[in-house]
């Protein structure tokens, strides 16, 4: 199934819940259209995983993930997304891996031209920490 995945350039934003009970952005990237040279030869991302290691600014104990598909004309189907503390390069500490849910389900679809936000997830996110976010398509 072909998908124009606005990569993890599916504007990905990580939010933490502050003591003042407001969501605060701790990491984000600007969405952009897909460049053909960044995609697989057949433009198919089905049954693939995309991992991005990011360094957050502030930590927290409850987090959410915001994903965007605003530049695509096709929906993007996601089988699951998990976060874990990053080790060296793209390695993770598997003991810390936790899956995000969307409406209490691990699977979700990001409609074309839309954004979605995960359910809140209890996760020990430390200030200036590197975490790995893995999207299974």
Language-model regions, residue ranges each:
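N-terminal secretory targeting modules
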Residues: 18-137
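Bacterial Sec-dependent N-terminal signal peptides
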Residues: 1-23
